[in-house]
């Protein structure tokens, strides 16, 4: 099995990258892909860049060039569920765009023409992630993750997301674009991210302060998940 892992920022991939043995770097389309073995398992780790276009471009290049069997999207996210704290884990059961609106033509808010309203994560990957969470004794929430090209840092943007997606547990900027590409390629995916901030008016300050905490927690989760997927 070859496992594809995608993070947007240097801070989100550096700990995983340092753990890859026999590492080689591939530069394509402004993205960097690091291939090798993570604890004996073949992996391809993509640093995509921030935002939906960068994530979709990178995911496409990763799938075409490295042919992974599954995709794990890792990194940080803003917490929407009331129980979430910095360092807690969110696991997707679905991903949706929070900034797409073609409702004038009868589509659901967040749905693009020709696409489902949401992109479902793979049940087996979800189950494996939840098993890792139990083993590591981490606090986690599973649910809807929403994505858009905005850092949510204020009451207006937050209120709009809560209105349109009352069940969303986290918000970030890449996951749904990655899920969209995986849907088109029929490749199973799951989003496993750690909370770096709670989406509110102080979220930019929390993000800067706690990104390293989120990166450490998400790296721990991904490393454990890769082991479980490879060896059961």
Swiss-Prot record:
Substrate binds at residues 78, 152, 173-174. It catalyses: S-adenosyl-L-homocysteine + H2O = S-(5-deoxy-D-ribos-5-yl)-L-homocysteine + adenine; S-methyl-5'-thioadenosine + H2O = 5-(methylsulfanyl)-D-ribose + adenine; 5'-deoxyadenosine + H2O = 5-deoxy-D-ribose + adenine. CDD domains: MTAN. SUPFAM superfamilies: Purine and uridine phosphorylases. The keyword Acetylation does not apply. GO terms for molecular function: adenosylhomocysteine nucleosidase activity; methylthioadenosine nucleosidase activity. This is 5'-methylthioadenosine/S-adenosylhomocysteine nucleosidase.
């Amino acid at each position: 099995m070859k496992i594809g892992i995608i993070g947007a920022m240097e801070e989100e991939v550096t700990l995983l990258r340092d753990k890859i043995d026999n590492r080689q770097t591939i530069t394509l389309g402004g993205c960097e892909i690091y291939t090798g073995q993570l604890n004996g398992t073949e992996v391809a780790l993509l640093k995509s860049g921030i935002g939906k276009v960068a994530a979709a471009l990178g995911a496409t290049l990763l799938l075409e060039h490295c042919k992974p069997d599954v995709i794990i999207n890792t990194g940080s996210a803003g917490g929407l569920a009331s129980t979430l704290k910095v360092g807690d884990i969110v696991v997707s059961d679905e991903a949706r765009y929070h900034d797409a609106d073609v409702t004038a033509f009868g589509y659901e808010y967040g749905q693009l023409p020709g696409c489902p309203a949401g992109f479902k994560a793979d049940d087996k990957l979800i189950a494996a992630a939840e098993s890792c969470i139990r083993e590591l004794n981490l606090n986690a929430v599973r649910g809807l993750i929403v994505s858009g090209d905005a850092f949510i840092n204020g009451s207006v943007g937050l209120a709009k997301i809560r209105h349109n997606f009352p069940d969303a547990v986290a918000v970030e900027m890449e996951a749904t674009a990655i899920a969209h590409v995986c849907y088109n390629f029929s490749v199973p995916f799951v989003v496993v991210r750690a909370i770096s901030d709670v989406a509110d008016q102080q979220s930019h300050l929390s993000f800067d302060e706690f990104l390293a905490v989120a990166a450490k927690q998400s790296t721990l989760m991904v490393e454990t998940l890769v082991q479980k997927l490879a060896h059961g």
